[in-house]
Amino acid sequence: MSEHHNGTEASLSSEQRARAEMVKLGASFFQRGYATGSAGNLSLLLDDGTLLATPTGSCLGELDAERLSKVSLSGEWISGDKPSKEVSFHLSIYRNDPECKAIVHLHSTYLTALSCLEGLDTQDAIKPFTPYVVMRVGKVPVVPYYRPGDARLGEDLAKLASRYKAFLLANHGPVVTGKNLRAAADNMEELEETAKLIFILGDRKIRYLTADDIAELS
């Protein structure tokens, strides 16, 4: 009885920590301008196999730990406020990438601007010119534009999830995964800063990493 009780306490404290971390990281993204209004969403896998996600219409800067959405991997709304409609594409990634434990989706300025450009390499939107994107996420494929909530977005991400750790949704913004929420957040920030460099460099000639450079990092 005592062991069962202690296990329950440990599980609860683990979920409470996860909720607190989501609130903290959401506020950090908002305060530093990575997220505005009610744009973007976060999710993570809990120890019990369910998903914790930001609710529909929520501002990342004003999340309430007790009102975060809890959803099953089959998409059933378990508790908390109603989940974002975009949680469906989060679920598509989790179901197809066993290494993914957390997802950050933002409408951050520079990555969203990049997602609106024509002529991007759909296999890798960010040609490597610093080592850090290669080390953190590797290639970043472009997913075709669909209206937010369209089931086809999840279908496309499901096909890519086992091979990539980050995705650029055309005319929409980035989706980045991680082994935990902090890692996903760090990966997102690295990508956003790299996209910022792309616009700062503009038409200047960039010294891209060679195939050998990339091989040493992979």
Swiss-Prot record:
NCBIfam families: OxoTetrPhDc, PRK08130.1. The keyword Transport does not apply. It comes from Pectobacterium atrosepticum (strain SCRI 1043 / ATCC BAA-672). It catalyses: 3-dehydro-4-O-phospho-D-erythronate + H(+) = dihydroxyacetone phosphate + CO2; 3-dehydro-4-O-phospho-L-erythronate + H(+) = dihydroxyacetone phosphate + CO2. Coiled coil: none annotated. One of its GO terms (cellular component) is cytosol. Belongs to the aldolase class II family. AraD/FucA subfamily. The lineage of its organism: Bacteria, Pseudomonadati, Pseudomonadota, Gammaproteobacteria, Enterobacterales. It is an enzyme of class 4 (lyase). Catalyzes the decarboxylation of 3-oxo-tetronate 4-phosphate to dihydroxyacetone phosphate (DHAP) and CO(2). This is 3-oxo-tetronate 4-phosphate decarboxylase. The active site is at E86, Y132. One of its GO terms (molecular function) is metal ion binding. Zn(2+) binds at E86, H105, H107, H172. Keywords: Carbohydrate metabolism, Lyase, Metal-binding, Zinc. It holds the Pfam family Aldolase_II. Its cofactor is Zn(2+). GO terms for biological process: pentose catabolic process. Its EC number is 4.1.1.104. Binds 1 zinc ion per subunit. It comes from the Bacteria.
